Amino acid sequence: MDKLGVDLPLLISQIVNFCLLAFLLNTFLYKPVLNALQARSERIRESLDNAEKVKQQLARVDADYEAKLQEARREGQTIISQAQERARAQEAELLVVARNNAAKIEEEARGKVEQERQQVLRGLQGQLASLVTETASNVLGRELQTKGHDELINKSIDQLGRLN
């Protein structure tokens, strides 16, 4: 091999050095890098799996949120409807009470008016009786007897009352 220009001991030493270097690189560099790449690949896969789980959880939470929101809306609408019904019932009840009070006040007012009317009529009867007596005395020129006088006055007043 000397003819080719290759030195055999140098070639063997280079082959041994290359194998030793390949072994050392494989042991200390290639395997740790490969292990690191596998670990990284595993972490990425786990992260993707976790991301998918989180995405599914978010979808469930979102669905739960929407369901609860719909339930809250239904409950709110129910509460509003019930409040409106109670308000209508209270309004009707208050109207009945107000009408009853108004009728009662009107009845009391009518009673008072009638009572005052009767008092005024009694007062007018007394005045009318004395005026009639006085007028009759002046016209007749004498006093009427008390018994006849009272009967005549009451008869006249009754006739006037029937005309009104």
UniProtKB/Swiss-Prot annotation:
The chain crosses the membrane at residues 10-30. It is found in: Cell membrane. One of its GO terms (molecular function) is proton-transporting ATP synthase activity, rotational mechanism. CDD domains: ATP-synt_Fo_b. Its main location: membrane. Keywords: ATP synthesis, Cell membrane, CF(0), Hydrogen ion transport, Ion transport, Membrane, Transmembrane, Transmembrane helix, Transport. It is a single-pass membrane protein. GO terms for cellular component: plasma membrane; proton-transporting ATP synthase complex. SUPFAM superfamilies: F1F0 ATP synthase subunit B, membrane domain. Belongs to the ATPase B chain family. NCBIfam families: ATP_synt_b (TIGR01144), PRK14473.1 (NF011043). F-type ATPases have 2 components, F(1) - the catalytic core - and F(0) - the membrane proton channel. F(1) has five subunits: alpha(3), beta(3), gamma(1), delta(1), epsilon(1). F(0) has three main subunits: a(1), b(2) and c(10-14). The alpha and beta chains form an alternating ring which encloses part of the gamma chain. F(1) is attached to F(0) by a central stalk formed by the gamma and epsilon chains, while a peripheral stalk is formed by the delta and b chains. F(1)F(0) ATP synthase produces ATP from ADP in the presence of a proton or sodium gradient. F-type ATPases consist of two structural domains, F(1) containing the extramembraneous catalytic core and F(0) containing the membrane proton channel, linked together by a central stalk and a peripheral stalk. During catalysis, ATP synthesis in the catalytic domain of F(1) is coupled via a rotary mechanism of the central stalk subunits to proton translocation. PANTHER family: ATP SYNTHASE SUBUNIT B, ATP SYNTHASE SUBUNIT B', CHLOROPLASTIC. This is ATP synthase subunit b. It comes from Herpetosiphon aurantiacus (strain ATCC 23779 / DSM 785 / 114-95).
